[in-house]
């Protein structure tokens, strides 16, 4: 619920900043459990069905963005009386706050606990793997991948996982000499740790291990990085940007039929993962919350009503053309978008169970 609260708080706070008055701030849908009305006249609610939330602004009786074909009176301080850029900012604020919330969580994580990282050095190979075929040797160090700096083995694995079948240009260091090579990770099927078989990229390199105990990492290549607040903020922003770009990349591949649909998490799979992660400790749950918050923000930016991105598109068109899209056209697009979203939700739910039992 905290992710939903952050999302709706974004709409509410930026709406207030733009001079738009809110009549309702609700966590959940359906019958009210508890609530109170503040001095500004906003009713704060906790509702029975915890599947989302909403902010209802004055003069926007159909919800946050107004889809009714009926003309509503323009009242000072209402959503309808606001300039298009203010309405766009209010709509965009929800997903933006989700991303900022992730940055806040990760900044706290890096500043308080730091980061244990394995240096990106080749410690072993999988036989006949793409890395072997490319001529890599033990002790080779990864410097860059497709122009991005490689700071840890985790960075390397995260990137390769999402780029199975795609050529990746690596900048490597060997005995003080820098060279460039292109490696195409092969696509393999593996267990994702949550009972699903998924496809992912495999390059075939392993971490450096202790020569005296191959079951342990070589301590010479393990470093505990401590961050000042400024560095923690920069690292958190960098990590959040990476999550956003890889999520967008994944969705593009999924829609293009190039990604394993079992990597998509619907509501039931998300709850299952959250429960399993919570059993491993607070830090793991905190990290999962950061990832989930960005996911909620990005999904809401899809340019399809009733998602935020659909209404944001309406307001951007109004900014460009100088006049709003007619209420009738908005309502038609809304109904089509709602059907699409419901179908996608049904697919995500069915996909969860299909991937569990297939």
UniProtKB/Swiss-Prot annotation:
Ranges that cross the membrane: 89-111, 282-304, 332-354
GO process terms (BP): proteolysis
UniProt entry keywords in alphabetical sequence: Cell inner membrane, Cell membrane, Hydrolase, Membrane, Metal-binding, Metalloprotease, Protease, Transmembrane, Transmembrane helix, Zinc
UniProt xrefs under Gene3D superfamilies: 2.30.42.10
Known EC number: 3.4.24.-
Binding-site list for Zn(2+): 7, 11
UniProt source species: Bartonella henselae (strain ATCC 49882 / DSM 28221 / CCUG 30454 / Houston 1) (Rochalimaea henselae)
Pfam families: PDZ_2 (PF13180), Peptidase_M50 (PF02163)
Protein name: Putative zinc metalloprotease BH06270
Superkingdom in the source lineage: Bacteria
Family designation: Belongs to the peptidase M50B family.
All copies of domain PDZ, residue ranges: 102-177
Entries under NCBIfam families matching the protein: RIP metalloprotease RseP
Active-site residues annotated for this sequence: 8
Main localization category: membrane
PANTHER family (alphabetical): MEMBRANE METALLOPROTEASE ARASP2, CHLOROPLASTIC-RELATED, REGULATOR OF SIGMA-E PROTEASE RSEP
Cellular compartments annotated: Cell inner membrane
Record flagged with keyword Cell inner membrane: yes
Gene Ontology MF term list: metal ion binding; metalloendopeptidase activity
Entries under InterPro entries matching the protein: PDZ, PDZ_sf, Pept_M50_Zn, Peptidase_M50
GO CC annotation: plasma membrane
Membrane protein topology class: Multi-pass membrane protein
Cofactor: Zn(2+)
């Amino acid at each position: 619920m905290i992710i939903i609260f952050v999302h709706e708080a974004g709409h509410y706070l930026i709406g207030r900043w733009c001079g738009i008055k809110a009549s309702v701030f609700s966590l959940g849908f359906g019958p009210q459990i508890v609530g109170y009305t503040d001095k500004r006249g906003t009713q704060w609610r906790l509702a029975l069905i915890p599947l989302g939330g909403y902010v209802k602004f004055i003069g926007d009786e159909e919800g946050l963005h107004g889809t009714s074909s009926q003309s509503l009176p323009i009242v000072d301080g209402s959503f309808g009386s606001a300039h298009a850029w203010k309405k766009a900012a209010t709509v965009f604020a929800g997903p933006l706050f989700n991303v900022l919330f992730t940055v806040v969580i990760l900044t706290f994580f890096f500043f308080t606990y730091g980061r244990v990282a394995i240096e990106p050095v080749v410690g072993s190979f999988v036989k006949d793997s793409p890395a072997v075929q490319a001529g890599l040797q033990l002790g080779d160090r990864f410097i860059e991948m497709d122009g991005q700096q490689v700071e840890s083995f985790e960075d390397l694995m995260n990137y390769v996982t999402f780029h199975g079948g795609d050529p990746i240009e690596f900048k490597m260091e060997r005995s003080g000499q820098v060279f460039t090579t292109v490696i195409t990770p092969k696509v393999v099927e593996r267990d994702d740790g949550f009972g699903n078989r998924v496809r992912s990229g495999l390059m075939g390199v392993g971490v450096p291990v202790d020569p005296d105990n191959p079951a342990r990492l070589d301590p010479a290549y393990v470093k505990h990085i401590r961050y000042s607040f400024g560095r923690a903020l920069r690292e958190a922003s960098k990590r959040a940007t990476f999550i956003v770009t890889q999520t967008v990349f994944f969705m593009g591949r999924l829609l293009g039929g190039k990604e394993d649909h079992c990597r998509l998490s619907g509501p039931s799979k998300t709850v299952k993962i959250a429960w399993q992660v919570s059993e491993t400790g607070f830090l793991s749950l905190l990290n999962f919350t950061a990832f989930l918050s960005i996911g909620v923000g990005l999904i809401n930016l899809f340019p399809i009503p009733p998602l935020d991105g659909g209404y944001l598109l309406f307001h951007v068109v109004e900014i460009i053309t100088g006049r709003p899209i007619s209420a009738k056209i908005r309502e038609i697009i809304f109904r089509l978008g709602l059907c699409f979203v419901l179908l996608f939700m049904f697919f995500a739910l069915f996909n969860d169970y299909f991937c569990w039992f297939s």
